[in-house]
């Protein structure tokens, strides 16, 4: 089975997404306008035990997620996930640029669990 991540745009079309390890530049974008709910440069999210990933449509950062692989518990813990302000239900005024970001990040957590030899 192949993992083909996507979200839906405002016209309800599937848009392919790439998911890669978060870079310091990705984290810094959360401190610029339009501000994200959370600064991903914060001490809490800087925890080295967390695997952090960036979801992008082309070069556009649409979401960030932090996961904690807990092999002794046989799970991947989703520590935190957040959509860009334009697609964040608490910030977008009811008209998100992209939909399905939460489901995408949960699905990626399941993939990360399977890839880590856990049970998904």
What do the PLM-derived regions correspond to, one by one?
Residues 1-97, 104, 108-120:
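Non-catalytic substrate-recognition and accessory regions of acyl/acetyltransferase enzymes
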